[in-house]
Amino acid sequence: MAAVKTPVIVVPVIDRPPSETFPNVHEHINDQKFDDVKDNEVMQEKRDVVIVNDDPDHYKDYVFIQWTGGNIRDDDKYTHFFSGFCNTMCTEETKRNIARHLALWDSKFFTELENKNVEYVVIIENDNVIEDITFLRPVLKAIHDKKIDILQMREIITGNKVKTELVIDKDHAIFTYTGGYDVSLSAYIIRVTTALNIVDEIIKSGGLSSGFYFEIARIENEMKINRQIMDNSAKYVEHDPRLVAEHRFETMKPNFWSRIGTVAAKRYPGVMYTFTTPLISFFGLFDINVIGLIVILFIMFMLIFNVKSKLLWFLTGTFVTAFI
């Protein structure tokens, strides 16, 4: 009996072909070899094999899929993932990105994986790049042996951590540390049953509120879920903030500042990614990002000190129309 392949699922967060997440393997993986799976669908059996004569990079271990479900812009059937407060106050980008993952965990596809006794799934958002996937085989074996439920492959907070050996061999030296409130859905490996249990608990509790990361950490504690974070994960999974920053500017109303922002995103991707990160929604009418918050504080400053410069008010107005 053939071994069950581990699904590698690409979740689109920007307009980009799924194969660009794996740039060095176009001879094995191209866009036609990615199955598109969406809501109420299961994986077709024909994609069980990637045909290559030799497999030094382990690509026969996996079946490659692009998840196209969970689009909250299509309809409102994903509102049950969020509380009434979050549906009003959480930003559109936050809800959109979280809904994609929760809809995947809650899909018929994941139920089918559980029925087929598939233990783990690798999930990668398409603003990441993985140039060498040979680390996945020993990592999957190690997290099975160590009973790890979730391996997060993007670090949110760096610093001194108590690290534990995960994989030590001639090719890889990988360590992990226990996750807390530093939750990221950018790139991770998750046990199928764990994903099903988490999304079931979220729905039963009335949906996520604004504190998504705190709630996920709370659920993990209550359900005794072992989530580890890969130390120095950028060595294996490279997140490109430029792609998201450019995407945010491209989806803004075309104006002078959006054009300036697109250019700045190429030169200062990390800074522009941070500045364009949405913080809160104003009752679902519009989202306020970091730049928008700075503009609001600047307006308050000008009102308090009764600034009468027409140029400053004009420039502030252009920022308001562009970023708020």
From Swiss-Prot:
Q: Which domain of life is it from?
A: Viruses
What InterPro entries would the database entry show? Poxvirus_P35
What does the record note about the induction of this protein?
Answer: Expressed in the late phase of the viral replicative cycle.
Mainly localized where? virion
Subcellular locations according to the entry? Virion membrane
Disulfide bridge positions per record: none
GO biological process terms, semicolon-separated: symbiont entry into host cell; virion attachment to host cell
- Per UniProt, what is one Pfam family of this protein? Pox_P35
**What GO CC terms are in its UniProt record?**
membrane; viral envelope; virion membrane
Q: Per UniProt, what is the membrane topology? A: Single-pass membrane protein
Which regions span the lipid bilayer? Answer: 285-305
Q: Which UniProt keywords apply?
A: Host-virus interaction, Late protein, Membrane, Transmembrane, Transmembrane helix, Viral attachment to host cell, Viral envelope protein, Virion, Virus entry into host cell
Question: How does the record describe the protein's post-translational processing?
Answer: Does not contain disulfide bonds.
Relate the protein's function as given in its record: Envelope protein that binds to heparan sulfate on the cell surface and might provide virion attachment to target cell.
State the family it belongs to: Belongs to the orthopoxvirus OPG108 family.
What is this protein's name?
Answer: Envelope protein OPG108
Species this protein is from: Monkeypox virus
Q: What is the lineage of its organism?
A: Viruses, Varidnaviria, Bamfordvirae, Nucleocytoviricota, Pokkesviricetes
Which gene produces this protein?
OPG108
